[in-house]
């Protein structure tokens, strides 16, 4: 496998983990997609798109979502790295 292919495969793997951690964190806190969207000023569909992988989670989104859930962003990053 070429370096670029390996990098893309690793990126896709990490994106899936990030999405899984965000969704699990939201569900652990018993926060609905609609409630999280409201806290962020987003539409519930935007949360759904993130959680099903149709939208890439940018670093800024990750930080905003963590704050909206009342979680320190560092803890989310740590959870991603342990997944």
Give, region by region, the residue ranges found by the protein language model.
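The DNA-recognition helices of helix-turn-helix-type DNA-binding domains
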Residues: 43, 54, 80-83
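Short alpha-helical DNA-recognition segment
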Residues: 30-52
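N-terminal flexible/basic segments that precede or flank functional cores
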Residues: 1-24, 28-29, 67, 72-78, ...
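Residue-level signal for the short linker/turn that defines the boundary of a DNA-recognition helix
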Residues: 20, 30-31, 57-60
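Short, basic-rich loop-to-helix N-cap that marks the start of a DNA-contacting helix
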Residues: 54-67
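Residues within the helices of the helix-turn-helix
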Residues: 23-24, 34, 45, 63
């Amino acid at each position: 496998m070429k370096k670029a292919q390996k990098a893309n495969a690793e990126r896709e793997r990490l994106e899936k983990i990030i999405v899984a951690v965000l969704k699990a964190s939201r569900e652990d806190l018993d926060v609905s997609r609609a409630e999280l969207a409201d806290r962020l000023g987003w539409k519930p569909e935007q949360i759904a798109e993130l959680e099903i992988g149709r939208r890439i989670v940018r670093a800024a989104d990750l930080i905003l979502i963590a704050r909206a859930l009342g979680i320190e962003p560092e803890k989310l990053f740590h959870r991603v790295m342990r997944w």
